[in-house]
């Protein structure tokens, strides 16, 4: 799918331009919502209250009350991924999350925050999480744990990229094969996949951060 001409830039990759576009859109929505807050909410305010309330409940249920401090980051990532995924369904637009670099940027932020939180909460004892339950397994467990942690950002990035980019390819092929019969149910499926992939990225991010705060056994 080709980028819209007004968003095309020969010096900046298209996924970066669309990421900026979505960030500007979310900031604008936030400012409009803040200025237009009412006791009796309108449709837009009600919709956003449901979305943000759902994110808040998800963070609390997954991470407990300690997770409240991470709500701004998790909610921001969730909104960005959701809007990015859905943007690709609009003719002429691209999903930034269909590019591996966009997803890797978010995954690296989660990776760095995870270990920063672990060190901040546990100090030097944080390394115990990499050593396993008994001392004689340390030579085996440390490489395994290091690899498992280093793979996390790669897993987050590739999972989201594969599902979103793969979905776009399937939709494009089906549009060519049966442009009048298949698109509508496939688009509903794409919306569902977009929601699921947003939740998966959020849940895994929260689980990684919550795991870093737990005591090593």
Swiss-Prot record:
GO cellular component, one term: plasma membrane
Topology of this chain in the membrane: Multi-pass membrane protein
GO biological process terms, semicolon-separated: proton motive force-driven plasma membrane ATP synthesis
Pfam family, one: ATP-synt_A
Region forming the signal peptide: none
Subcellular location: Cell inner membrane
Residue ranges of the TM segments: 12-32, 70-90, 104-124, 130-150, 169-189, 191-211
Superkingdom of this protein's organism: Bacteria
UniProt entry keywords in alphabetical sequence: ATP synthesis, Cell inner membrane, Cell membrane, CF(0), Hydrogen ion transport, Ion transport, Membrane, Transmembrane, Transmembrane helix, Transport
GO molecular function: proton-transporting ATP synthase activity, rotational mechanism
InterPro entries found in the cross-reference section: ATP_syn_F0_a_bact/chloroplast (IPR045082), ATP_synth_F0_asu (IPR000568), ATP_synth_F0_asu_AS (IPR023011), F0_ATP_A_sf (IPR035908)
Subunit-level organization: F-type ATPases have 2 components, CF(1) - the catalytic core - and CF(0) - the membrane proton channel. CF(1) has five subunits: alpha(3), beta(3), gamma(1), delta(1), epsilon(1). CF(0) has three main subunits: a(1), b(2) and c(9-12). The alpha and beta chains form an alternating ring which encloses part of the gamma chain. CF(1) is attached to CF(0) by a central stalk formed by the gamma and epsilon chains, while a peripheral stalk is formed by the delta and b chains.
Function: Key component of the proton channel; it plays a direct role in the translocation of protons across the membrane.
Record NCBIfam families: ATP_synt_6_or_A
Protein family membership: Belongs to the ATPase A chain family.
Protein's UniProt name: ATP synthase subunit a
Annotated source species: Syntrophus aciditrophicus (strain SB)
């Amino acid at each position: 799918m080709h980028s819209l001409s007004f968003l095309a830039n020969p010096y900046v990759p298209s996924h970066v331009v669309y990421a900026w576009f979505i960030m500007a859109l979310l900031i604008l929505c936030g400012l409009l919502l803040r200025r237009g807050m009412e006791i009796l909410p309108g449709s837009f305010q009600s919709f956003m209250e449901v979305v943000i309330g759902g994110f808040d409940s998800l963070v609390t249920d997954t991470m407990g009350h300690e997770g409240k401090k991470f709500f701004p980051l998790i909610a921001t990532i969730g909104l960005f991924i959701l809007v990015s995924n859905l943007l690709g369904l609009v003719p002429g637009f691209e999903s930034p999350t269909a590019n591996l670099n966009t997803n890797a940027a978010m995954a690296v932020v989660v990776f760095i925050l995870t270990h920063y939180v672990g060190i901040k909460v546990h100090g030097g004892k944080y390394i115990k999480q990499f050593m396993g339950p008994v001392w004689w397994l340390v030579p085996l467990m440390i490489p395994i744990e290091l690899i498992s942690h280093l793979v996390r950002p790669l897993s987050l990035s590739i999972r989201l990229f594969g599902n979103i980019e793969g979905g776009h390819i399937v939709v494009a092929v089906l549009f060519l094969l049966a442009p009048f019969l298949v698109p509508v149910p496939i688009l509903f499926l794409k919306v569902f996949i977009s929601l699921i992939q947003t939740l998966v990225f959020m849940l895994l991010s929260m689980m990684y951060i919550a795991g870093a705060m737990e005591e090593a056994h």
